[in-house]
Amino acid sequence: MPHWAEERHRRESNYVALEAGLDEGESIRRSEHSRSGCGADAGCWRCRGGPGRGSRRSRRSRGPGGTAGPVDPPAVDLLAPPPDPLALPPALDPLAPPPPDPLAPPPPDPLAVPVAAGPVAGQDPTSFVGPPPFRPPTFNPVDGAMVGVAKPIVINFAVPIADRAMAESAIHISSIPPVPGKFYWMSPTQVRWRPFEFWPANTAVNIDAAGTKSSFRTGDSLVATADDATHQMTITRNGVVQKTFPMSMGMVSGGHQTPNGTYYVLEKFATVVMDSSTYGVPVNSAQGYKLTVSDAVRIDNSGNFVHSAPWSVADQGKRNVTHGCINLSPANAKWFYDNFGSGDPVVVKNSVGTYNKNDGAQDWQI
């Protein structure tokens, strides 16, 4: 072969080798190997890349600079049987957890701040915007207070309100959780708001009265139910019975029955003087009295308390002997005094009549 033809053949062999993924040195060796008259023999040291060097496969597995190059595909077993299209899938492990649902909502963030779900009847979680239609009012409960679940919101104005609807629209009540409720007026200078049912335990309540703001919280749902049919007071905390006390309520003689209804704690005194003359009964009359009592918890503005009465312990749990108050033993009255606070409800049932006096504490009868 002429020299120029041999050189052309060598270059063409290099191009073919480079396109097949071989480096230039390997292509030169192939060219020399072909000129030497050797066939493509796997046992030839030339075909293996020369003495002391790796095979062609090992050299192809290295890229430029010694880095990993393309890897040959795995071998296929031509004798393996084809997959059975009718074969059943492997049985699921009944103890294995179900796979996650890609459409399921993400779990709640335990660190997220609770937000009211939206307005309900009587509530408005938005901030008041605009000129205030009244001077800054005062609130009860006071800002930051912890109260019972029967506590209403009391808003006192500096001057009488002529347009009550406008005033109500400027007062935004909201709570977490949201609960429906209503406004009601006690006087031209006082409006109140309460939920239709007791506040849930541990509720956060916010008030925005034309830009004057306040907030409070409820504690546990502590409820006393005085049942005149059994002469027992049952106390529940968050729906679970915690205490049952024998009691005595208002006697029939003289019309002193304790009326049915929902009361709530207004205030309490370690000791207080009770004087029948304060409601028109002379102290020296047959129904009169004047004595000092302990652990007295006021539940209305008509003279009714839950209090200690050591003189009526023998009657408690059996009969009614009081002038309207709820008598407890000294130990039970002390527990009641220590645990019940502002806004905790006292429900009287199976008695006579209904609590309907306009004494400023009849919120749950309105």
Swiss-Prot record:
CDD domains linked to this entry: LDT_IgD_like_1, YkuD_like
Entry annotation: catalytic residues: H307 (proton donor/acceptor), C325 (nucleophile)
Domain of life (superkingdom): Bacteria
Keyword set, alphabetical order: Acyltransferase, Cell shape, Cell wall biogenesis/degradation, Peptidoglycan synthesis, Transferase
Compositional bias segments (type: Pro residues): 80-111
Enzyme class: transferase
PANTHER family from the UniProt entry: L,D-TRANSPEPTIDASE, L,D-TRANSPEPTIDASE YCIB-RELATED
Name under which the protein is recorded: L,D-transpeptidase 4
Upper classification of the organism: Bacteria, Bacillati, Actinomycetota, Actinomycetes, Mycobacteriales
